[in-house]
Amino acid sequence: MTSRPKARLVAVLGALVLASSHTAPAAAQQAPKRLLFLTHAGLYKHSSLGPAEAAVTAWGRDAGFEVTALQGYVQEAPSLDLSMVTAEYLAGFDGVMMMTNGNLPMSPAQRQALVDFVRNGGGLVGVHNAALTFYDFPEFGEVLGGYFRRAIRQRHLFVLRVEDREHPATRMLGPSWPIVDELYQYGTAPWGADRPEENVDVLFGNRIPMGFSRDRVRVLMSIDTELTDLDGLEEIVRGGDYPQSWVREYGRGRSFYTSLGHRDDIWSNDPVFRAHVVGGIRWALGLEDGDATPRGAR
């Protein structure tokens, strides 16, 4: 639980970087886009799944999309039934949002249908623990952009460097965004038998099948190691590269990812975070334009 003084500090600083009180431009007079929200706790159950589902459902009413939530978080992982999520079912949606970890109970054909859905023009929105999903299906990682390797301390005040201030997911921000949340570090190379302890998810032992690369995605935000207090943060070093949000195009589709969203309360009391997530969703759904061209090494 974040301490009240630190939470107030972040709220004040966040207000300074929020350029508009609106989460998105008024939706055009057209049928709302349809977003399927998948939650699943195959490895670890985040308490933020319920608040996230409720928040995104509400936000969509004013942002041009409607949410179908399967409420996977209320079921024990072994009993979750996703047998209906087929290519035909996905055809009824414009995008899929995922706060999931581990292997969802989906057949190889269903997994491939999800990837093909994006390749053929659908949108994918991955939030926080989505990067711990389908370690044994590298094509999912190709769509999302990378896989989780380790968590960076919770309840720490990080300063994020905003690398793209024109994209719908970040244009509400100034050059820096101070925020308290759990951030992630991503695998930079695939696991190899000659390096059995490298490129492995340090929490659950999953072998990372592909490495994150700035040559593949357009990074929107990364940890500013000059402005962030690194005292006690053994996971990162000053001058290191720690992307936390990015976008990419995959075939005719779009993929947006953010590491943020671990905290329950961030889904209800942070207008900057709301604008960030809604902007990313709208971009992934094709409601707004934004450059996804990779810019290579920082």
For each of these PLM feature ranges, what is it?
Residues 10-21:
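Bacterial N-terminal signal peptides
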Residues 22-28:
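Signal peptide processing junction and immediate N-terminal pro/mature segment
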Residues 29-33, 39, 47-50, 54-62, ...:
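Extracellular ligand-binding/catalytic regions of CAZymes and related secreted enzymes
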Residues 29-32, 61, 88-92, 118-120, ...:
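Extracellular/periplasmic catalytic domains that process cell-envelope and extracellular macromolecules
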Residues 34-38, 43-134, 267:
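Helical hinge/lid and interdomain linker segments adjacent to catalytic or ligand-binding clefts
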Residues 66, 154-251:
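Catalytic beta-strand/loop cores that center a nucleophilic Ser/Cys/Thr
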Residues 103-178:
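A glycine-rich, often tryptophan-bearing local segment used as a flexible ligand/cofactor-contacting loop or short
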